[in-house]
Regions:
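Active-site histidine-anchored catalytic micro-motif
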Residues: 2-174
Length: 174
């Protein structure tokens, strides 16, 4: 499943699926989705990709943890509805305004974890902490990913457009 196109609302997202690990017993596998985001507060819907991974896994009972290793992103489950996404964008801007002062961005004060090419993104780190979700885990029962009727799996970009990764792990409980 390489260079897939996944429809994300009005956007189309290209991603590459990379197999990282498969156990000898075929009871678990770890995959990484590599993709580029396009904007701040972008919601990337990976539900169909995860459903396809589960279907191809042939796991009857297990779980699927999803994880982002980025501190300025989130993985959430919610409804794919334009009004909700617009409401989220408005409220997160009210709670953590882009134009506020963030000590994280003050190079005269900050002395830790600094890089020359670092983004001015204190607000993105605060937003990620408020959302507080770098991962979710869903059950697989009778070879079916258990997810609510209106629920979708979203990767949320809280910083600027950039290359990102989402790890998907399939675990067999049998």
């Amino acid at each position: 499943m390489k260079n897939n196109k996944q429809r994300i609302g009005a956007q189309e997202l290209d991603f590459e699926l990379v197999d990282l690990y498969k156990s000898e017993s075929n009871k678990s596998a770890t995959l990484a989705l590599h993709f580029d985001t396009e904007e701040t507060n972008q919601f990337c819907d990976f539900t169909e990709a995860v459903l396809e991974i589960v279907a191809k896994s042939n796991i009857k009972h297990g779980s699927v943890p999803l994880f982002t290793p980025h501190t300025t992103t989130a993985v959430v489950i919610n409804e794919s509805e334009t009004g909700y996404i617009n409401d989220f964008k408005k409220k997160i801007e009210e709670l953590v305004p882009s134009d506020s002062y963030y000590e994280h961005d003050d190079w005269d004060l900050r002395t830790e974890n600094m890089q020359e090419d670092e983004n001015v993104n204190g607000r993105s780190h605060v937003r990620g902490t408020i959302i507080g979700s770098t991962g979710v885990t869903l059950p697989i029962i009778n070879s079916e990913l258990i997810i609510g009727r209106w629920q979708r799996l979203f990767f949320v970009e809280l910083d600027c457009a950039r290359s990102r990764r989402l790890f998907v792990q399939i675990q067999d409980l049998n």
